């Protein structure tokens, strides 16, 4: 694809509680926070970031996290009354006409209908989740799936790995629309 410039606007919507629980269950308590400086460039792959929103249940939200997302990615943290499912779904629906791609960082099968709806609106939908904590139906419905790795977390003692984008148990895939 030499000489071809792909210009896409991407919104990344993170279900913070789901991802934090998944990372902690998979890698331990010291690795439950996302290292955004590693993960976001891996997801974007030279595409433009339109929005980055971290949805988090409750009022105990780190001001350092909010400041970091705002200063480095012009992102924000949205506190949620209960689960992030409904606020994230509403925001994704609102953004559908403004972006080319929406990345949902969650393994929760509750987002399957949202993925189907966004795709019917012509939006490319990608899922980013921890491999053993993602619903297979969510992977199947998405246009693309990113495995969140230990190297995408703070506290990771492993050397930084390159992108591994695949379904659990399969070779690399990138569905075409």
Q: Predicted segment positions?
A:
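Domain-level signal for Mg2+-assisted phosphodiester chemistry and nucleotide/NA-binding surfaces
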Residues: 1-84, 94-97, 124, 129
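Nuclease catalytic cores that cleave nucleic-acid phosphodiester bonds
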Residues: 58-171, 175-176
